C-alpha cells in the first residue's frame, strides 16, 4: 500500500463537484494543530445527486466499503451505503475516506458549511469546519486522542 495521497482524494472530490466539509485530522491541521491522520474525514451534503457523485469518485479510485462480511465496490453499492445516513469508511487506492454522518455531536452538512472557512489543504481549496464546530465534535467524541486534540486546539489561541 502506498502512502495515502489525501491531496488526490480532495482534488477528485472537488473536481467532481462533491459538496463536502473537511472535519477530523485534516481540519485540525488547517487550524494549526499538527498531527498525523490516517484518513480524510468529511461531512457531505446528503442529497442523492451529491452522494452519487461521491460514490463515482470512490469507485474511480477503487473504493470499497465493508458491509458485514462482504465488501462493496460498485458505485451503486457505495451510494446505497451512503444513503443509509450512517458513517461510511471507504478504503481506496489513495487512502481511507471517512464519510462522517449520523453520529452524535456532528452537525448537519448545512450547518457546518454555513460556518466553514474556505482554505487550502495540501494545495486544494476546500471548505473546512469552523474551529468551534471542530472543538464541539472533539468534545462529543470524547476519546483520549480527541481530548488531547482539544488541548492542542486551545493552545493555538484561536
Label each residue range with its predicted role:
Residues 1-158:
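Compositionally biased terminal segments of proteins
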Amino acid at each position: 500500500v502506498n502512502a495515502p495521497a489525501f491531496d488526490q482524494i480532495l482534488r477528485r472530490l472537488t473536481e467532481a463537484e462533491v459538496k463536502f466539509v473537511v472535519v477530523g485530522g485534516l481540519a485540525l491541521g488547517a487550524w494549526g494543530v499538527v498531527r498525523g491522520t490516517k484518513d480524510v474525514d468529511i461531512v457531505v451534503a446528503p442529497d442523492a445527486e451529491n452522494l452519487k457523485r461521491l460514490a463515482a469518485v470512490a469507485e474511480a479510485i477503487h473504493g470499497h466499503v465493508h458491509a458485514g462480511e462482504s465488501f462493496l465496490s460498485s458505485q451503486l453499492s457505495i451510494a446505497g451505503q451512503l444513503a443509509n445516513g450512517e458513517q461510511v469508511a471507504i478504503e481506496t487506492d489513495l487512502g481511507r475516506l471517512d464519510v462522517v454522518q449520523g453520529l452524535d455531536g456532528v452537525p448537519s452538512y448545512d450547518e457546518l458549511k454555513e460556518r466553514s472557512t474556505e482554505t487550502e489543504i495540501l494545495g486544494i481549496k476546500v471548505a473546512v469546519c469552523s474551529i468551534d464546530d471542530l472543538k464541539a465534535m472533539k468534545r462529543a467524541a470524547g476519546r483520549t486522542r480527541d481530548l488531547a486534540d482539544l488541548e492542542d486546539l486551545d493552545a493555538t489561541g484561536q
